[in-house]
């Protein structure tokens, strides 16, 4: 068993005492929760391909529509995406996977699959048992009830449920006018990223919804974007330099609309810290690239 994982003799009682609520979903998994724990259902390859097709279509549609109509399409409307996936599923299944794999969609699926597997491996190796990730427990396989399809799952591991995503915390603080606290959480986020670099890990998908809040800590929720491959890190940093205002790229434009001073301070700190020199200052010496 990897270091940092807790092996329990049986599953936490709350996982089996009632039906687990559907908490959220991503490209590769669906998450269900009890009061203190979450479990995950991995999507089938055909589900992931269907979602990739849908997102490609939505992005094309968003580009030709006026901004006020196109942008909402890309804000992850979960129920609509679910419906579209169900409608797309027969088309995906009818076409052999070998055909899909020869297309750009197949290439995107392979990239997603390899990055997700690599990220999970890196998280198990370097982050398990640390304060950078929620607690993770394993136990003998047990059948649990879940809301919606398929109605039940067999699970053998669970992860500590966080209070909310980092994005949701920032959104709530902005809505209530607590901008001093919002800025403090942004500082914690930047400190969290630097702590990850000290362990030789960089996230190429550092969206605020991929991070959670528990107590006064920021934790990583989705390890799929983790990499220790320096050329990939440099490519990502290069793209970020030309991507515009960091706070807008992270989805905080609407949250900081009335506080351009906070947006400007965050953007300045981000550009200083999340840069080649900034990352190198924290990167472990034994794996640091030649400059």
Segments the model singles out, each with a brief description of its role:
Residues 175-189, 197-204, 213-291:
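C-lobe/activation-segment region of protein kinase-like
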Residues 4-17:
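A short, low-complexity linker immediately N-terminal to eukaryotic Hanks-type protein kinase catalytic domains
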Residues 80-186:
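Conserved structural core of kinase catalytic domains
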Residues 19-21, 25-124:
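ATP-binding glycine-rich loop module of kinase domains
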Residues 42, 162, 224:
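Anionic group-transfer/hydrolysis microenvironments
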Residues 209-210:
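Conserved protein-kinase catalytic-loop position immediately C-terminal to the HRD catalytic Asp
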